[in-house]
Design a protein with these regions (language model features):
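Short flexible coil/turn linkers enriched for glycine and charged/polar residues
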Residues: 130, 266-270, 302-305
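Histidine-centered active-site/metal-ligand motif
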Residues: 63, 89, 93, 171, ...
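Solvent-exposed, non-transmembrane regulatory segments of membrane-associated proteins
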Residues: 282, 288-350
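Conserved beta-strand segments that form the floor/walls of ligand-binding pockets within enzyme
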Residues: 101, 139, 273, 277, ...
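Short edge beta-strands and adjacent turn/loop segments
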Residues: 254-277
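Short secondary-structure junctions
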Residues: 249-258, 300-305
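A short interface-forming secondary-structure element
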Residues: 271-289
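Alpha-helical transmembrane cores and adjacent cytosolic helix/loop segments
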Residues: 2-239, 243-246, 339-345
Length: 350
């Protein structure tokens, strides 16, 4: 059967027990790093923003505050989603990560609204900015720190298939863009004071803040869409579904067909179920071993997969759903139907 490595949308290998523990430690470590870095940046931006009276720096402090809250939520989600399934949650706790991503997106929307409100207030009643150079410096440091931490979050988030970490990474990545925008706005004010002394350039600061808000609203919408998909039990990505079909189809002729393939995802966990059609003369024992073999194969390549297979006999009735996933050639189907008709005719009438 085809090897899924390198196929778009298909994880290379499943996570074994030892590797899962290492992955969990990695996830917790980078989540804690995000909390610590955001705490430091919030303090720095607040001090500088209040000192120089810059609404754009203050808006960035609020943005980093939201990032800090998101980082704490991500840390909670990472720890909770790793809990084993129990009687109350038989499918596990994976959706905690999806809920985390949705909440983080809503927090970004709220932060954007506050930034726009404050920026409009500053446009209508501008206030002088003192020591804009400090604002430029703190925005530069913020950008550098967030680039490093967000890259690490993206890396671990993709490797461990963590929705919460990737959502946290998007928070920090938007902070990079917004910090750069504020830095440019303050730098223009600094340069303008030297080149055009007396010119009114204070409007640049709130305009930069509004541009910041528009950028993070765009990121929030994308994050809401992505995290909401799994909450609504959307199917696995097309690449993964195509690979599952290819994997099962490769088992013909022992497998006559399959249908009613349904998939969904909760955090990093995948749930796959389908009806497997086999020869009607196959013993229950052999059919059971076949289903077990397919389950092991899918679990070996799809991370944290739970596979449910319903085995049914190929009796030649060829219902519409069965025909859709039939692996037999037309001639073979006719032979099965003929055999079924012969059996029916030979059966004693009641």
């Amino acid at each position: 059967m085809a090897n899924p490595e390198g196929r778009a949308g298909v994880p290379r290998v499943s996570v074994k027990q030892g590797d899962r523990m290492d992955a969990q430690r990695q996830k917790s470590a980078v989540a804690w790093l995000s909390v610590i870095s955001n705490t430091t940046l919030v303090a720095g931006k607040l001090i500088v923003g209040l000192s120089i009276g810059s609404v754009s720096v203050m808006s960035e402090a609020i943005h980093s505050g939201v990032d800090l809250l998101a980082a704490v939520i991500a840390l909670f989600a990472v720890k909770t989603s790793n809990k084993r399934a129990d009687d109350e949650h038989p499918f596990g706790h994976g959706k905690v990560e999806n809920i985390s991503g949705t909440v983080e997106a809503l927090l970004i929307f709220l932060a954007a609204g506050w930034i726009v409100y404050e920026a409009i207030h500053k446009l209508l009643a501008p206030e002088p900015i003192g020591a804009a150079g400090w604002g430029v410096a703190v925005m530069f440091v913020s950008s550098v720190v967030n680039i490093g931490v967000s890259e690490l979050l993206f890396k671990v988030g993709r490797e461990t298939d963590s929705v919460a970490l990737q959502a946290d990474a998007w928070h920090l990545r938007t902070d990079v863009y917004t910090s750069a925008g504020v830095m440019v706005g303050l730098a223009l004010i600094l340069v303008g004071e030297q080149v055009l002394p007396g010119a009114d350039l204070l409007w640049l600061d709130p305009v930069a803040a509004i541009a910041v808000a528009l950028l993070i609203v765009r990121a929030a919408w994308k994050l809401t869409r992505e995290s909401g998909r799994d909450l609504l039990d959307a199917s696995l990505p097309p690449g993964e579904i195509a690979w599952i079909r290819e994997r099962v189809s490769a088992l013909t002729p022992i497998v006559r067909g399959f249908h009613h393939l349904r998939t969904r995802k909760a955090g990093a966990a995948r749930f796959i179920e389908f009806h497997l059609v086999v020869d009607k003369d196959l013993t229950v024992e052999r059919a059971h071993h076949l289903a077990d073999s397919i389950t092991r194969d899918l679990k070996a390549h799809l991370s944290e997969a739970t596979v449910t297979i319903h085995v049914e006999p190929c009796d030649g009735s060829c219902r519409p759903a069965c025909l859709e996933g039939c692996l037999l050639a037309a001639q073979e189907r006719e032979a099965v139907r003929a055999h079924r008709s012969a059996d029916t005719a030979a059966a004693p009438k009641a």
